[in-house]
């Protein structure tokens, strides 16, 4: 671009000179007319200010969210301020100089953008919404809050900013959230289903993911590793429009199904597939707790189990003919396990049986006198032997 080195100049009082000339003409006076000039110093050229005013990269035409209209982009100019100042210093006052600069022109013009604005569906996903009526209400409300959001090229989209505070004052109802590993009542419970559905749509649209965290436990309304939890105002889900054109997020509701579509402008026929792999699992165990409010031996499950696991996801981009262009690691999601808790009615203690009393020993009976022994019979006399006969 061109600049002229400032030079000193002279100024005169034009009104005073005009009056003097008029007087000389009307009086036909031919005397010399005095004209006094004043030297004015040339204003220094502030090239740093010029760089701030016109410098910068070229900018494409964009969508004005306030007016709903397409606005023209701008030509970008970048130059070395120090080198330009040296050229000016070496030049003569009033000399015109050529300052070396890099000029970048917008690749998307206003007329071109108006023809293709939000023409194509870049990515979409539908998830089924279940649960209490209050949870379903929260999902519908969050989906409505983000619907119609426009993100210009290079800009970020914050889910929390779009949804707003998930409080009672903001109109949300009590759903369920996980705090400390337990499901507890919480205002806005259920809004994570919308952020998760948006996340999967953004992956399929091949958008850049700036900030995303998985749930404590795996959810079943999106594929494993494709969920995105939020907790206003601390934990956010953020995506970036890394395309050359504005994108618009639009949500739909039908028969308890929430659909998120991302509209934009496709410049080729490529598409995305997400694949995942479970790399480890964490089993759960059963914990029994004795309680007094159940009949002895009766069981009641107070916490149902969840298997923990770690899953890795990849983003695979294919051309229009189905040929793989790229396969990049997307994220690793670690889901906790949760034990099964069973309450069991406490057994009532049984009293110890009383032992039978030990009987007193019976007294020994008085001994009877022993009978006298029978006397031995007296021996009979032996007869004399008879003499033999003659």
Predicted regions and their residues:
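Well-ordered beta-sheet/strand-loop patches within structured domains
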Residues: 8, 19, 23-29, 34-390
